[in-house]
Amino acid sequence: MHNNNAAKNLDMLKIMDMLEPEMRAAGREEDFSFFVINHVLLDSISRLAQQTAPDRDSVIRAFRDYAHRKVPKLTQCKSYQAEARNRRIIMFLNYHGMERLAQFILNVKKKV
């Protein structure tokens, strides 16, 4: 992916911050965790890792920091545990700052 809109992805975190109090007040903590691990940790970081934007790494770091704050113990999160094994592997790698390895695995999988 060769676009340079990495910083625009930070809007996702603003939306998540607006969504969080509503979901927690309604007793939907697990649903919020689902959004964090799927949309922030998996989709957004994986998409950003493919970009060539100069600020890509700092934006990925912001997403990873957000995931750490909202889901401090990833492997104990019920939403994480409910995911398929391959998705959990990519989430785990993204959570721990190994998004390049995650992208390598995904690219190899595409070619097989």
Q: Across the structure, where does each feature detected by a protein language model lie?
A:
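Flexible helix-coil transition and linker loops at the boundaries of alpha-helical arrays
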Residues: R24-S33, L74-Y80
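Amphipathic, non-membrane alpha-helical segments in soluble helical-bundle scaffolds
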Residues: N5-N9, E29-F34
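Amphipathic alpha-helical repeat scaffolds of TPR domains
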Residues: F34-R47
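Short helix-capping and hinge/turn segments at secondary-structure transitions, especially at repeat
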Residues: M18-R28, S46-A49
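Short, charged, amphipathic alpha-helical segments
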Residues: D31-V36, D57, R61
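Nucleotide-sugar-dependent glycosyltransferase catalytic core
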Residues: M1-I15, L48-S58
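Membrane-interface aromatic/basic loop that binds lipid-linked glycans or pyrophosphate carriers
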Residues: A53-V112
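Amphipathic alpha-helices of TPR/Sel1-like and other helical repeat/solenoid scaffolds
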Residues: M12-E22, F63-K70
